[in-house]
Amino acid sequence: MKIKILIPVYNDWQSVFKLLENINSEVSNLDHEFSVIIVNDASTETKPELSINLEKLNSIKIINMKENRGHARCNAAGLKHIFVNEEFDYVIPMDGDGEDRPEEIKQLVDNLNYHADKPIVGERIKRSEGIFFKFCYFVHKIITSTFTGQSIKYGNYTCLPKSTVEKMINEKATWSSFSGALAKVEKDRASISSERGTRYFGPSKMSFKNLIIHSLSIIGVFKINVFIRSILFLLVYLFLIQKNITIVMLIPIILVFGLIVSVFMISKRESLDELNNSLLNISNIDNLK
């Protein structure tokens, strides 16, 4: 099988090169052809020379983008490039900072023996971040499940068959949220248990603002569900409090309306036209191997 590993990067070459070394080690005993596609999101940091021997990787390409578009759109453009220009059977998207553990590639690939035609997702069973992030992630899961009806416990770290990649690049939500789009286009998914690793170098680049945007982008994929469930919630809530309405009791109503507005606003980031034209943002492609 030909498996492409897709890695977005922005100003974190040290981590990516360490990840390449670890991937090379982890796939050494797997009888498949592994290649790596790195999407460089217009990094301003100088890329060092690759001085390590990566004999188990068939090829390594760096797609250099003209303009910075963000992590989700790097993944979308990478999927588009691979589908249009590469020969492959599966794509494994993963973060370039070490938090998606290369040790789990074998689990993903082994599961293809049982789920060859399904996307396989890495469902988080353990996270390495601090207490605040874990709390925010817990709240995100509760809100997502309650207002969308979706249980999305995975991120980018997945193994996608070619048929799923084709669906993803023809879904406008992929331009805004990878995991949300995958949940939308593929209802039947297999999974492995995945532990969130620690960053190889430096602190996390995920700010609280970006965390909120990331969460709303996922929820926004299912904005119609959010609207319907929100209206039902408000009707039930108003019925229950109608005889004893206070200012404090109006707070949940305000929060729900705020959620609806935020979700519909952020869903405007979704764009099939921009996804279709994403390869025009490519400056050049470096072949490291």
Task: Please give the residue ranges for each predicted region.
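Terminal low-complexity segments of carbohydrate-biosynthetic enzymes
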Residues: 225-289
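A conserved acidic beta->alpha catalytic loop
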Residues: 40-49, 98-99
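Short beta-strand/loop segment that forms part of the nucleotide-sugar
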Residues: 32-43, 63-64
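Cell-envelope/extracellular polymer assembly enzymes that use nucleotide-activated donors
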Residues: 2-4, 35
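Acceptor/aglycone-binding surface of glycosyltransferases and processive sugar-polymer synthases
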Residues: 65-67, 71-81, 90-93, 99-176, ...
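Donor nucleotide-sugar binding loop of glycosyltransferases
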Residues: 12-16, 43, 101
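Catalytic donor/gating beta->alpha subdomain of glycosyltransferases that bind UDP-sugars
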Residues: 163-225
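Short, well-formed alpha-helical segments that are part of the catalytic scaffolds
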Residues: 12-27
